[in-house]
Amino acid sequence: MRYIALLRGINISGKNKISMPELKIALGEKGFGDVKTYLNSGNVLFSDDEPDAVKLAERIRTIILEIFHLEIPVFVIPQDELKFLLSKAPSWWGSDSKDIYDNLIFAIAPNSIETVAEKIGEPSAELEKVQIYGNAAFWSFDRKLYAKANWWKKTAAPGIGEMITIRTANTLRKIAEM
């Protein structure tokens, strides 16, 4: 089965540095098939026979700890499931508007998106929109006023940030088709 692993918080402002070519080699050497990476932000595609995405995430997390000596949360989703999820996007999400920034928030096991949403609270009216589907949340916000948006302020906050990983609509569309 084809999977996508999303690594949380790597290669940001010189922190949690992981070389994508080195990670690709390491995962291949540890038995993952047809490993590919996209961008430097921790997007990894691979094949494996394991049906449990949470077990795969734990295997990848352990490999990263062993090779790179970093404790990195990992979210894994079957590629077909990501495609299905993207097909369920609300009409306001993923537009071509340069004024709006569209993201998808994934809850990293054992967390649920409902718990994350409860901790963050209601989105700021007029500034952002949120719609939960499965264990993810479609989230869009006004690029000019993002700093005033409730979800923007809280997604990186202690107690919430480590529960999630976030990707843009464009990144997810690309890796869904790779």
Kindly give the residue locations of the regions a language model identified.
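Surface-exposed, charge/polar-rich loops and edge strands
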Residues: 1-41, 45-178
